[in-house]
Amino acid sequence: MIAITHLSNVTGAILPVKEITDLAHSKGIIVVIDGCQGAPHLKLDMQDLDCDFYAISCHKMYGPTGLGVLYGKKKWLEELPPYQGGGGMINLSLIHI
């Protein structure tokens, strides 16, 4: 797996993520792109980029903090087990008024 940024917040450089993804996929490598800086400034086409995962932070697009988006190809999302799920993970719930 490789993880790369789409657009650098330090230099402003836009990386050639499509070309990097094509090369990585030719070697069987999964590609994760950090799109937190790129998403607000670039036109995104996930089918064209062909990355396996693309992460976006909403606060970089003037959204609320603590929210984000993780795009993933269907084949990978179907293989990943949930990290946590449903109410079954709750042992104790109290209401404090």
Positions of PLM-derived features:
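Pyridoxal 5′-phosphate
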Residues: M1-I95
